[in-house]
Amino acid sequence: MRAILVNSEKNYIAYGNEQYQTKNTEGFDVAPHATIEVLIKSKGTESHGSTLYLWRYPCFECAKAIVYAGIRKVVYKHEDNSDPTRSEAQLLLEHSDIEIVKNPDLDF
């Protein structure tokens, strides 16, 4: 999965790529989702008012991070119907006045 963060002037801020198969010594998956990786890389200083481009609709944990970071718009390519937190994520984003746009033609 991928994520790209751009500011209100459409300037690139950060890119994130979800890492798979990253486990700690106890076998737990410790890889952050692409959304979280983007926010870590942006250091939180440039995310307010920005747009986040995602490969798939964000999970609830990523939605919380999106709201906290002050991101104003989320553009995504694919639905993730297997995510049990999808409806909670949608409610949180909608109630936080974040614009959500599905763009199946998104290419990155």
Describe each PLM feature range.
Residues 1-108:
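Zinc-dependent deaminase catalytic domain
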